[in-house]
């Protein structure tokens, strides 16, 4: 049986906590508050959470998928983000960030290299635009793995170049561990970085990270499981 990133981090986590509507903001933000005090964002795929409940939980907004449900992903009721959800978040003063991930593990998007990057970037751009995303807002392309340096050079870097060829360097974000972020920086790939902790030594925040995913699968808002992400820089790819 294969073990996923979420399995590794979930098994390492303490007993899950539950938060919901009406719980004080400190319950959500205090354990994960960023050093700069910029707040936290939620990311989730299993459903759509009303803006009122996100606000009540103490989050500044959401990182939302502009990607389709993959085969067997019928539980991903929150994919892709729809314009009605985006309007609800905007009208309630919450931040929105776009991210893209279709495949996972053996079907990971980045395994297809540059041609896959072009294909997925085109689809991400379509869904981002359909949801009302601004033309200048970035999309985070997911490297939801702990790739080796050889995998980075042969597959991840070409995948990111594919994204940049479609939406441009300034609009390409990278979701990856701190090692992947460092390699991308060395190659001049990506303008925004969202760090996860699978393969990030000690879970330390990379200095270039705009966002840092610090907790997964431990909390629930509005009946939907959420991950917690620290905002590390004032500009983190939010819709303007």
Regions found by a protein language model. Give the residues of each.
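N-terminal secretory signal peptides and thylakoid transit peptides that target proteins
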Residues: 1-19
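C-terminal region of N-terminal signal peptides and the immediate post-cleavage residues
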Residues: 19-37
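Functionally critical loop-and-helix segments that line ligand-binding/catalytic clefts
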Residues: 36-47, 51-53, 181-240
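Active-site cleft segment of glycoside hydrolase catalytic domains centered on the general acid/base Glu
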Residues: 146-167
């Amino acid at each position: 049986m294969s073990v996923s990133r979420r399995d590794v981090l979930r098994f390492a986590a303490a007993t899950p906590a539950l938060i919901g509507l009406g719980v004080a903001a400190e319950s959500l933000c205090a354990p994960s508050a960023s050093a700069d005090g910029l707040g936290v964002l939620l990311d989730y795929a299993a459903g759509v959470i009303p803006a009122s409940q996100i606000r009540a939980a103490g989050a500044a907004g959401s990182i939302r998928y502009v990607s389709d449900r993959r085969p067997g992903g019928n539980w991903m009721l929150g994919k892709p983000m729809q314009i009605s959800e985006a309007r609800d978040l905007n009208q309630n003063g919450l931040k929105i960030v776009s991210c893209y991930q279709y495949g996972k593990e053996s079907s990971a998007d980045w395994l297809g290299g540059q041609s896959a990057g072009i294909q997925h970037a085109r689809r991400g751009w379509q869904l981002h635009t359909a949801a009302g995303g601004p033309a200048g807002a970035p999309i985070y392309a997911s490297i939801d793995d702990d790739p080796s340096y050889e995998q980075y050079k042969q597959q991840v870097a070409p995948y990111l170049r594919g994204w940049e060829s479609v939406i441009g360097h300034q609009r390409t974000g990278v979701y990856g561990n701190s090692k992947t972020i460092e390699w991308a920086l060395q190659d001049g790939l990506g303008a925004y970085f969202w760090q996860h902790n699978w393969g990030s030594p000690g879970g330390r925040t990379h200095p270039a990270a705009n966002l840092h995913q610090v907790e997964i699968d431990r909390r629930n808002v509005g009946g939907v499981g959420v991950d917690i992400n620290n905002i590390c820089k004032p500009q983190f790819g939010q819709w303007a």
